[in-house]
Each structure stands twice: as structure tokens, then as C-alpha cells.
């Protein structure tokens, strides 16, 4: 049993998207482009189209500029680099259904729901129609539209200010520890996402959900893909 909470009951929950609600992984695309050679694929992703390179697009850099710049550095890899943008839709996996079920519980209970995600402003419109649950959010802040990425505290403040949220009654859920730490430093109630059952227990402890399991979600676990990639 958790200790009784003396602080006010939270009134809003903010979700990260990639790795929490959406399974995103560039390997879904690049396994097709490196058939039978996972080692070469991993080298390409680690040394060419790196996470830091992708994060610059999440911060607002145009994809055309990103592809051109990287292709100039690695002309022998130009077609593979261009595929990251041209075939970006193939990096998307399924919704992480156990977490979607937790989100559905919150939605049906009337809690204010928001999303805060490191994501390119150019590619998010590709993803949005694929995941109907995104319509449950009162607001979605996409880093590429603002020009700031997590864990920069300015992005969290942008969310709080735009929607009039009190950090002390706002819950933030993210699978990235640095993003969770940044939220806590602003006084937000932050939860490091591990899996859907663990998340649900934390939300029960906060008084946001009742006891009892959501419809079948717990058995499925609810983490990201086995490769562990996610939008930041």
C-alpha cells in the first residue's frame, strides 16, 4: 500500500509519444535496406543517421537540409540517408496498446490529457492519422513546431503556459530519464515509463485511476520494441 497523498490530486496528465504510446524504430525501415546484415545496419544507424542527427530535425531543422548536409559528408551513403525521410512512414510501428488502454481509462475519467513529444514538424502529420487515440488529447506539443526539444526546460514551460497548467497538479510520463529529471526540476510530477502495468499502479497511487486492471493491458506488458528505439 502506498502512503496517503497530502498534496492535491493531479488534474492533468502529459504523455510522451514515442516509446510510450507509439512504437517508433528506424530499424523497421533499415532492415529492409540491409537485408540479412544487422551489423551493417547498426553501424549505419550509430555512425551516420545518429540519434543526435535525428534530434536536430526534432528541434526544427528542415529534413531537406538535414539529408543534403549528411549526404555531402557521406556521398556513398546518400540513397540510404535519403530513405530516412523519403520512407519515414516505414519507421512507424503499431500503437503500444497496453499504454493506450491506460490512456483510455484516463480519457473516460475526464482527466485533462496532453502530449509533449520530440518529433519533427514535417513527419508528425504523417503519423497522426495512424493513431486515432491522438484525438483524445486536449493539446499536443511537438518539439519541431516550437524549435526546442526535451529536456530543455523551455519546452515544458511552453506547455504549462499554453494550457494554463499548474506543475504541482500535472503528471508527466516519459521513457527518457533526462526528460523526467527536467520535469521534476520544474515541480512537475514525473514518472519514468517502464511498462503499462507499472504506469497504471503509479496513476492509482496518485488517485487518478481506480483499483483493478485495465481491459487486458497488463498481460501484454506495454513497452517499446525489442530494439528499444523511441522518439525522444
Report residues per predicted region:
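Alpha-helical elements of Rossmann-like donor-binding domains used by nucleotide-donor carbohydrate transfer enzymes
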Residues: 28-29, 52, 65, 69, ...
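Residue-level marker of regulatory loop/turn positions in helix-turn-helix DNA-binding domains and
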Residues: 95, 116, 148
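Proline-centered loop/turn at the N-terminus of a beta-strand
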Residues: 112-114, 189
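Asp-based, Mg2+/Mn2+-dependent phosphohydrolase catalytic module
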Residues: 1-13, 120-232
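Secondary-structure boundary motif
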Residues: 72, 76, 105-108, 129, ...
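Generic structural signal for secondary-structure transition and capping sites
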Residues: 53, 111-112, 208
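Generic structural signal for small/hydrophobic residues in well-ordered secondary structure
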Residues: 16-19, 60, 106, 115, ...
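N-terminal helical cap/lid subdomain that shapes the substrate entry/recognition surface
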Residues: 3-101, 108, 120-123
Amino acid at each position: 500500500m502506498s502512503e496517503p497523498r497530502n498534496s492535491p490530486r493531479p488534474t492533468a496528465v502529459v504523455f510522451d509519444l514515442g516509446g510510450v504510446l507509439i512504437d517508433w524504430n528506424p530499424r523497421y525501415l533499415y532492415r529492409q535496406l540491409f537485408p540479412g546484415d544487422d551489423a551493417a545496419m547498426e553501424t549505419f544507424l550509430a555512425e551516420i543517421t545518429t540519434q543526435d542527427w535525428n534530434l536536430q530535425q526534432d528541434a526544427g531543422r528542415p529534413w531537406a537540409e538535414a539529408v543534403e548536409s549528411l549526404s555531402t559528408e557521406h556521398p556513398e551513403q546518400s540513397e540510404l540517408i535519403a530513405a530516412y525521410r523519403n520512407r519515414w512512414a516505414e519507421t512507424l510501428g503499431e500503437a503500444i496498446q497496453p499504454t493506450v488502454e491506460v490512456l483510455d481509462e484516463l480519457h473516460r475519467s475526464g482527466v485533462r490529457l496532453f502530449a509533449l513529444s520530440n518529433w519533427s514538424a514535417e513527419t508528425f502529420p504523417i503519423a497522426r492519422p495512424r493513431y486515432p487515440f491522438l484525438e483524445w488529447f486536449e493539446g499536443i506539443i511537438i518539439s519541431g513546431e516550437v524549435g526546442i526539444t526535451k529536456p530543455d526546460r523551455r519546452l515544458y514551460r511552453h506547455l504549462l503556459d499554453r494550457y494554463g497548467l499548474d506543475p504541482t497538479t500535472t503528471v508527466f510520463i516519459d521513457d527518457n530519464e533526462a526528460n523526467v529529471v527536467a520535469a521534476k526540476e520544474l515541480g512537475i510530477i514525473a514518472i519514468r515509463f517502464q511498462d503499462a502495468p507499472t504506469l497504471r499502479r503509479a496513476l492509482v497511487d496518485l488517485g487518478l485511476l481506480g483499483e483493478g486492471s485495465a481491459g487486458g493491458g497488463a498481460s501484454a506488458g506495454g513497452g517499446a520494441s525489442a530494439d528499444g528505439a523511441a522518439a525522444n
